[in-house]
Amino acid sequence: MVMSRGFNPMQQVKALQDKMARMQEELALKTVEASAGGGMVAVVVNGRQEVLSVKVDRQVVDPEDIEMLQDLIVAAVNDGLRKSQEMAAQEMGKIAGGLNIPGLKIPGLF
């Protein structure tokens, strides 16, 4: 098999892996916000799908109805994670350009 000069597929894969690893680090710094219950519960999630904060308005804290608060927290967190995944996929897509390279997996991305 003859390879043309200047084309080294392994070098290109390594460069792509390096770019994606840098992007993963950048995603840790990017955040999305999500809320439920008209803003009564709000969460901040980073691009690595890590929940950074949860805020609960005092008005929604009812000792007689804990289930409602739990449902609002779950809804806000799930919405935040979905938004974070969409953001991460969009950012990574800029680098990968839709490539599907076997073995090129970035932990915590998908």
Curated annotation (Swiss-Prot):
Homodimer. GO terms for cellular component: bacterial nucleoid; cytosol. It comes from the Bacteria. Keywords: Cytoplasm, DNA-binding. The lineage of its organism: Bacteria, Pseudomonadati, Thermodesulfobacteriota, Syntrophobacteria, Syntrophobacterales. Binds to DNA and alters its conformation. May be involved in regulation of gene expression, nucleoid organization and DNA protection. This is Nucleoid-associated protein Sfum_2790. Pfam families: YbaB_DNA_bd (PF02575). One of its GO terms (molecular function) is DNA binding. Belongs to the YbaB/EbfC family. It is found in: Cytoplasm, Nucleoid.
